[in-house]
Amino acid sequence: MANAEQAGPATGRARLRNSTTVFLVGNIEPTMEWYKQLGFESEYYPPGFAILRRDDIEIFLQQQPGYAAPEDPGRRKREAWNVYIVTDDVKALYAEYSALSGVKISRQLCPQDYGMTEFDVMDLNGHRLVFAQPMR
């Protein structure tokens, strides 16, 4: 972390500020509606593009005609994650999302040996979102 703290104008080195996930989707409108269930607000930009926001998290959607969901990651030796989102209350978020009929919890809330408690959600396009919180 020391390198990140040392970056900035005084060092002559650009500092990276954040990262935004970009998901390809087959049909943007139902995908935007699905993310609204998760508490994201959406802004529709030019046709085929949207920005989703919830708190400090931002996800871009880009429509690609003929896009097909990735193969079921459950068939791979290790499940593929598309985005890893850290929250301050993973249990409350899990309860919130579990109560939604249109949301598929693809991995139940569970502690991990690397010090995080996590659960996964699969979106309409096969993208796996992991929600996590450090264990205390």
Please give the residue ranges for each predicted region.
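A conserved hydrophobic helix/loop-capping motif in glycosyltransferases and polysaccharide synthases
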Residues: V22-L24
